[in-house]
Amino acid sequence: MARKGNPISVRLDLNRSSDSSWFSDYYYGKSVYQDVNLRSYFGSIRPPTRLTFGFRLGRCIILHFPKRTFIHFFLPRRPRRLKRGKKSRPGKEKARWWEFGKVGPIGCLHSNDDTEEERNEVGGRGAGKRVESIRLDDREKQNEIRIWPKKKQGYGYHDRSPSIKKNLSKSLRVSGAFKHPKYAGVLNDIAFLIENDDSFRKTKLFKFFFPKKSRSDGPTSHLLKRTPPAVRPSLNYSVMQYYLNTKNQMHFDPLVVLNHFVAPGVAEPSTMGGANRQGRSNELRIRSRIAFFVESSTSEKKSLAEDKKGLPHFIRQENDLRFAGRTKTTISLFPFFGATFFFPRDGVGVYKHLFFEDAREQLLGQLRIKCWKLMGKDKVMELIEKFIDLGGIGELIKGIEIMIEIILRNRRIPYGYNSYLNEVKKMRSLLSNRTKTNTIIESVKIKSVYQSASPIAQDISFQPRNKRRSFRSIFSQIVKDIPLVMKKGVEGIRICCSGRSKGAEIARTECGKYGKTSRNVFNQKIDYAPAEVSTRYGILGVKVWISYSK
């Protein structure tokens, strides 16, 4: 009897199988290379270090399709062990981990012993040094204008914004945007207004930027990051981006405007000599550049393509957090002309039931920013009206409401969140061009992880990858957290993990459940999600079932 051989259908099974419909089967190497690069890039956008704040990229789910790529971020909260309680240093105030707020560049400081301290050294151990004045020139000590408070200024972290201050007026004085003594009057006027003007503190505008949560110690106890945009230039990109995307195109090149707007003599006062001789010329130059900025922003001669050419460089210069660490800095756009941009964006979002005229008059009458005198109030008001009329009220309101909704929803971390959105928008265009696909980057904010099966499966799959942990230890930790964070409506959770767990020689399947779970009832509401994790011992599979109440 002849030996029975393998049938031809078995030997030719690979050739006779139907073509795969999965995109990753044909471009697996390219997809893996792309995913690794994407994950490394997203993790390096703003990594938190010992001295700086940032966001941790906990999870990054990338889904590839023939014409689309979906990227989902999961940004976890800071671990509890890193949160400091009341045990803080006596010279420093407690700062929250999400305090991304950035003020203007501080530049070079001079201490009492006539030694120059660079800005990068402010946040070190010598942060408590007594800084009394900003010196213009060694030969003109008699012309020093003291705008820094005498008591010690505790800086929260290296190369970042100052910590929480108990007095907003003193917090305003550390803003590098007003470091030139010519603008000390502007600084003192705003501080005096907030301290002494009760009517200003009752306005909706004040409540918007200084919510009650940040005013626990009184009307003048605020976070520095809550200061108005005229002092805190952290939302420049949002404003610029909105105006570049309106239908009635308000054409201007932010890069050209920024370069022509800042006077070189004002950019670094510590290295400038002969301030009295240049005072009048700088004022004229600033006045002319404000006029140039407004006229260029209200003209219809340029094309939108020309505006977009200078936008990436402007984004990097104005919104990159590392830009604040440079020694040679530039005066921000907002201290001089910021109220004009500040009003059209916030005038609709804050004063929803008021007209533009009332909002403008309240803003100008209450803030009383002296920088308006550089051009004259009438001229500025005329240009504002021209600016608004050109854009169209309908489109302006629509764009402003969208922007205000984003800001209001995340106003606890005003600068950090917008900086993250800027990076995501830039990455969206970059990936679309590199991969030639329609790349969509989405940020997912989940209040409770234990309400959906997919986040749990992803969370479990990442733990064995980083370190050798057994399934029992992972499941026991989840069981401890479930009673605290489980939402109402969830009856139980079942988790199964298959593979060489913890490097075992023989693969096995381990399961665990919490609560009531049933996979055999047809009318049971169940959420199911699988996940795979590649380890040095092979591939581990994770399956999660969540049962919901009827």
UniProtKB/Swiss-Prot annotation:
TM regions (residue ranges): none
InterPro entries, per the entry: KH_sf_prok-type, Ribosomal_S3_C_sf, Ribosomal_uS3_C, Ribosomal_uS3_CS, Ribosomal_uS3m_plant
Keywords: Mitochondrion, Ribonucleoprotein, Ribosomal protein
GO molecular function, one term: RNA binding
Region (Disordered): 112-133
Taxonomic superkingdom: Eukaryota
Compartments in which it is found: Mitochondrion
SUPFAM superfamilies: Prokaryotic type KH domain (KH-domain type II), Ribosomal protein S3 C-terminal domain
GO biological process: translation
PANTHER family for this protein: RIBOSOMAL PROTEIN S3, MITOCHONDRIAL, SMALL RIBOSOMAL SUBUNIT PROTEIN US3M
Protein family membership: Belongs to the universal ribosomal protein uS3 family.
Protein's name according to its UniProt entry: Small ribosomal subunit protein uS3m
Protein source organism: Oenothera berteroana
Protein encoded by which gene: RPS3
